[in-house]
């Protein structure tokens, strides 16, 4: 009896040891575009694994401005002066949607591309957003509300409104193509803050749900996705979905898992511990980011060191943040150095190890 018991224990021990000794299989997270470039695939997988780390796990980011009008490297210079570090992600907006022009496509400017290419080659990641002009008008009006009937015309390529949208998308795609030709992956964030009532593509009333509007938004998002991905063959984009944290219906506009790589929140706050929407967005099972952040009242009093502490304590799945520039910038608020030097923060120059991304933690 004793001998049999000993043999049984030995078998259990050997089986357990074999299981424990088996290496953990790598879990690959791929972009939604199955034809994504290899570098874009590698960046996506690397980003998705950041929450598994114990440190160096949240990419810092900053908005550099609107191409041609305000974009420059001044924001990264300001942050470096304040902290000794540069943001890992640097953002440009291609669309100056307020601009009154003879042709709506003239509101699109991609002249920030050369700086974004340099930023990538020097260890950073570019992000591009779009404050699109309103195709219901000849130009401008990015904050002018439109009816659902006007929205439908924008989605119809045979109408004047639809042709205006297509003209803008064509010029945007031309700019994105320049970056792809140089092997530069892009965090691409179109149609943000759709659950707010301030952009033409979003809601028209404060926290008033409009199911038809939500459906029209999803159609527009998918139209842009298919144009960029299928028609233009752009395979370097990581698609970012970013509702506003201070409005309801954060996931109602979600176009579906097949169209989004990263989900996030545009969060302007006074209390970093009270940002709404984290649980809703992370429940979509996509990597999560704070796609815009800044003080709700821009008077220089926001302490960004509390923001990174809140990420650690309340929003630990965060893979990056992108702080807005000007008076919202960490450089002119409090705690910038603590934010950029926190053990969780990853800055420009800390993404790559030679020609390879820093190691993934499973």
Predicted features along the sequence, with ranges:
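Glycoside hydrolase catalytic-domain groove-lining segments
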Residues: 248-300, 338-339, 343-356
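N-terminal module-boundary/linker segments of secreted carbohydrate-active enzymes
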Residues: 22-107, 308-309, 351-362
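Bacterial N-terminal signal peptides
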Residues: 9-18
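Substrate-binding cleft of secreted/luminal carbohydrate-active enzymes
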Residues: 54, 58-64, 291-362
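Alpha-helical scaffolding within the catalytic cores
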Residues: 43, 70-79, 110-114, 172-174, ...
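Substrate-binding cleft of extracellular glycoside hydrolase catalytic domains
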Residues: 99-230, 234
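Loop/turn elements at helix/coil->beta-strand transitions in domains of secreted/extracellular proteins
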Residues: 54-58, 85-88, 122-127, 181-187, ...
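Aromatic-lined carbohydrate-recognition surfaces of secreted/lumenal glycan-active proteins
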Residues: 62-63, 189-191, 221-249, 288-298, ...
């Amino acid at each position: 009896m004793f001998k049999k018991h000993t043999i049984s224990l030995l078998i259990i021990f050997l089986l357990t040891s074999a299981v424990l000794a088996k290496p953990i299989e790598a879990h690959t997270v791929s972009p939604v575009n199955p034809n994504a470039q290899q570098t874009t695939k590698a960046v996506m997988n690397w980003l998705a694994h950041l929450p598994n780390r114990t440190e160096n796990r949240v990419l810092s980011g900053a908005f550099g401005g609107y191409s041609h009008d305000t974009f420059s490297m001044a924001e990264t210079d300001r942050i470096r002066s304040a902290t000794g570090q540069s943001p890992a992600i640097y953002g440009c907006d291609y669309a100056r949607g307020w601009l009154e022009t003879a042709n709506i496509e003239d509101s699109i400017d991609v002249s920030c591309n050369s700086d974004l290419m340099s930023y990538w080659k020097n260890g950073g990641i570019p992000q591009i957003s779009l404050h699109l002009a309103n195709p219901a008008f000849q130009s401008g009006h990015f904050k002018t509300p439109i009816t659902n009937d006007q929205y439908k015309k924008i989605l119809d390529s045979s109408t004047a409104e639809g042709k205006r949208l297509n003209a803008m998308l064509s010029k945007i795609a031309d700019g994105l193509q320049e970056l792809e030709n140089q092997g530069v992956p892009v965090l691409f964030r179109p149609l943000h803050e759709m659950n707010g009532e301030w952009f033409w593509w979003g809601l028209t009333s404060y926290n008033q749900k409009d199911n038809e509007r939500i459906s029209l938004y999803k159609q527009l998002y998918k139209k842009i996705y298919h144009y960029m991905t299928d028609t233009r063959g752009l395979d370097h984009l990581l698609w970012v979905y970013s509702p506003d944290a201070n409005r309801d219906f954060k996931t109602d506009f979600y176009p579906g898992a097949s169209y989004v790589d990263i989900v996030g929140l545009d969060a302007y706050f006074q209390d970093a511990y009270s940002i709404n929407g984290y649980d809703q967005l992370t429940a979509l099972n996509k990597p999560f980011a704070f796609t815009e952040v800044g003080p709700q009242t821009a008077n220089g009093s926001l302490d960004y060191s509390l923001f990174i502490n809140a990420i650690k304590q309340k929003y630990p799945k965060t893979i990056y943040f992108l702080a807005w520039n000007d008076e919202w910038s960490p450089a002119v608020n409090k705690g910038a150095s603590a934010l950029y030097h926190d053990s969780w923060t990853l800055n420009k120059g800390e993404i790559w190890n030679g020609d390879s991304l820093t190691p993934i933690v499973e």
